A protein has these predicted regions:
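C-terminal segment of classical bacterial N-terminal signal peptides
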Residues: 19-30
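Short, low-complexity N-terminal intrinsically disordered segments enriched in polar/charged residues
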Residues: 28-70, 183-198
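Residue-level detector of intrinsically disordered terminal segments
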Residues: 1-3, 19, 159
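Hydrophobic pocket/interface hotspot
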Residues: 48, 63-64, 72, 96, ...
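Bacterial N-terminal signal peptides that target proteins for export
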Residues: 2-15
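A solvent-exposed, acidic/Ser-Thr-rich amphipathic alpha-helical stretch
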Residues: 66, 70-125
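A beta-strand edge to alpha-helix "cap/lid" segment located at domain peripheries
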Residues: 32-40, 108-198
Length: 198
């Protein structure tokens, strides 16, 4: 009983703070709430898709300024990996519209983009997930690789506030390899073996 009273009081406080009556909050039907949620999801997806459609070097800076919040976070490939950052300098966590545009501008100088295909799009409220695959050719070495990718984005008030891009970084880093190999031991039961041997 006490929980119900507290919940009603909290609901009344929220309603008053928003300038709404408790009756108007309780009059929202599940269908109306779903419709609002679906509209928000569609709007969030639209922002992310518009950004992805404008990632060419001549468009990405304007797209980032238009579609990215000033304090937005971009997580590229890993939260923080100094060794990977030596190979892929955009690796890590950065802030602001320039973080978004600089990633795509650098990618364009490292690889020729041969294919970028979105296979699935999911949106719920302000959250958006995009999945697909891409094929890139390294500019310096000429090696080609194909990788799956996954994007998690958050959109608030028509601007992205968070963007996380994941790919097969073993494949992307290997596209620059000129020589060398690793000796790897994955479990105690298995013997060591070499990878990257030509």
């Amino acid at each position: 009983m006490m929980m119900i009273a507290q919940t009603r009081s909290f609901g009344a406080a929220v309603a008053l703070a928003a300038g709404m009556s408790l009756a108007s909050i309780s009059s929202v039907t599940p269908a109306q709430a779903q419709s609002t949620s679906e509209a928000q999801a569609a709007a969030s997806l639209s922002v992310v898709m518009e950004f992805l459609s404008n990632t060419g070097p001549d468009k990405v800076e304007a797209a980032a300024e238009r579609l990215v919040a000033p304090d937005a976070t971009y997580v590229s490939l890993n939260f923080d990996n100094p060794e990977l950052k030596k190979i892929l300098p955009w690796t890590g966590t950065n802030k602001g519209p320039k973080a978004y545009s600089s990633v795509f501008m650098q990618v364009g100088s490292y690889w020729k983009i041969e294919d970028f295909t979105i296979t699935d799009k999911i949106a719920a409220g302000e959250d958006v997930a995009i999945f697909g695959k891409f094929t890139y050719r390294s500019v310096a070495v000429g090696d080609v690789f194909t990788s799956p990718f996954a994007i998690l984005a958050k959109v608030r008030d028509g601007k992205m506030t968070y963007f996380q891009f994941m790919e097969d970084t073993y494949a992307s880093s290997s596209s620059f390899r000129q020589s060398g190999s690793w000796t790897v031991k994955t479990t105690k039961a298995k013997p060591s073996f070499s990878v990257g041997v030509e």
